[in-house]
Structures are given as C-alpha cells and as structure tokens.
Amino acid sequence: MRPVEWDIVLKLLEIVARQDGKIRPIELENIALAEGVFKSKTTGTPLAHSPRFYYRKALEHLGFVENISGKYFISKSPPILELISKRATIDSNKKRIIAELIVNNEDCKKNFVSLFLLDDKCKLEEIQNKSAYVIAKSYSIEHKQSSAKRSLKPIMLTSPLLDKNISIDTPDRIHAIFWGIRRWLLDVEAIDEIITSPKAGRVIYFVNPSIGEQLLLLEFKRFLRRYFTPNRDWIKIYLPDFYEYIIFNSQMRARTSVIKNFLVNFINENKSSVIPIPISGTMLNAEVKFEKQDAAFKRSFLNFHNIGYVAYLNINKTLI
C-alpha cells in the first residue's frame, strides 16, 4: 500500500477491461507505458519499476482486479463495474466508490479505518455522519540494526473517543499506512485533517459532505455563546478553537475548506461587527513534527491578501 494517483488506477482498470483475462501483470505495465499512462505528472518521464509495482498491487489489494493463474480479470462486483462503465477520469462519484472500497477492505480497516468506527459494520455514509476522530503524533525510539543504532520516527495513531491506538513503528508500516491508506482516503476526499497546535498532533476525521454554511452558522453561534457574558460587548476567539469544537464536540465535521469559506463569508458580511486579527510570524513558523506539517497547521488560519494570516476574530455580541 503506497501513494497512487487514482486517475492512473482507473486508466489501468480500463486497460484490464479491454484485455480481460488475457494479460499478465507485467504485460499490463508494458501496455500502460506504451500508452503513456505511467508518466510522472511533474516531469513527464516514465514511472520507475517500484511505483508501477505499487499501482498493480493497489489494483489487486482493493479488489479492482483478480489475479487468476497469473492473468488479470476484472472484478465483477457492482462498484467495479460502475467504475469502468464511464470515462477513466476521476470524479466525485468515483471518489465515493473508491472510498467505500478502502473502508470495506479488511487490511485498511484493521490498520487505519477501525480507529474511526463506532460500529465495526459501519458503511461509508454512516461513518461520515457519525464517527470518532484520530490524532497522529510522532515519537522517537531506538532501533538496532547491524549492531548500529538509528533513530526512527514512528507515528502513534490514537482514537481518544474509543480509547484505541495503532503504533506505526517501521518504515514499511509508515509508508503503507500513513502515506498509503491515509493518503488514499485524503485523495478521494473521504477524510480531512488539520493541526490546531504543532504539539497537539495532526487531527484526522471523516468528512460529512452534507454540512454546508447554514448548518455551520448555527454551530458557530452555539460556539460563540460559550464565550459571551452580559457585561461584554466584544469577545476575541481563536480560530483553531472553533475547528476543535467542530471536530471534537459535534458531528458537523465539514471539510476544512468549507469551514474556512464559511468564516470568510461571515467576516465579509459583517465587517462592522467582526475584526480579523493577524497571527504573529513566530507562531505561524512554529516548529512542527511531521514532514509538510506546516501546511496542515496553516490550514487552521484564514489568509487575507491585505493583512496576511488571521488567527483571531473580535466579534460583537449583536451577531449571536
């Protein structure tokens, strides 16, 4: 299980459908190379053997194809047949189908998805409506190899609501679970993640796609009521606190981009009653633990071209 581009997976599936039961795995690679499917999106050069191998394994592992006597056959399950009934390009419906395949896969469930499940038999739609969240943190251990010690950066996945955790403590498991299964679900927009504090870790959650700005407005006003007192006309709120409120204390788990769009619109529609306060450079550049963690941390804030990143809002009580 390694990172893959789902549009490439669908093109491979289309090739197998054309040659159903007639080609071997290596022949699929050769056809995909000849048709320009196995190309790097950044450099345009053909993919090396290892990533091509991982693409084939993703096809097999998630049940897109069956390897029978060394030849590839298309799975006859309805979701797979639906994927190949249209153009081999990714869209929201195909992302949903792929997300369901990942969620229902036993290895994916055991090593990642189970941490979110309030019921082991939950389907994707039920998980999106009601599920636990997971916190990912790195830690250090000593690992002996060839009489020499080397420092590893394993990752602990913790589900506070379920009191469960999974330790990803080897390079293979880190690649397979954190950069494999997690990345798969991110890319099909089934999950999202945010870092509200570098020390708190990366918060990962299943997105409820039905949550829009009207529902977020109701939830935002509930959040604001926790801070207002009768003798105060204004209150300062910290935006990551609102994200935590949404993710930890409600089932209104919208995508971070949806929450940010709501906040931007709320500010623009109430300019006389909402004052954005920018974040300091020191806080924005706080030390992070994961590769590319800074991008997830910045997602907690709003970015306005005229004032930069905004971490706080001063809000007048008339808006409650």
Q: What does each model-identified segment do?
A:
Residues 1-284, 307-319:
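Donor-sugar nucleotide-binding helix/loop cap in glycosyltransferases
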Residues 289-320:
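Hydrophobic, glycine-enriched assembly/anchoring segments
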